[in-house]
Amino acid sequence: MIATQKHFHRIIVNGKEIGYIQILSYNNSHPQIEYNLDEKYHNTGIMTRELVQYLDTIKNDYKAITAVVKEDNLASIRILIKNGFIQIPFGKAGYKIYLKNL
């Protein structure tokens, strides 16, 4: 499966790129959000705030998006829940899938 990258957003703090958010589409369906943040900035609220703004920017381009997260990545799960994602009953062992209707 080849992913198409869309809506790439760099997270910049004090002139330094510390993370990103993007949408990946597989075969033009099932858009999936992916994000990453430098560990030094974890638990600061930056990703939660950036994701709020990002979702507002893309809301007219998608009906819904998904996120796949390791089930032990509690910080990422909290970010998704704070941004209105709900867990759906699909996924492979060790991972959870979250969905957000836009």
PLM region spans:
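Conserved GNAT-fold acetyl-CoA-binding loop/helix
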Residues: 1
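Acyl-donor (CoA/ACP) binding surface of acyl/acetyltransferases
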Residues: 4-102
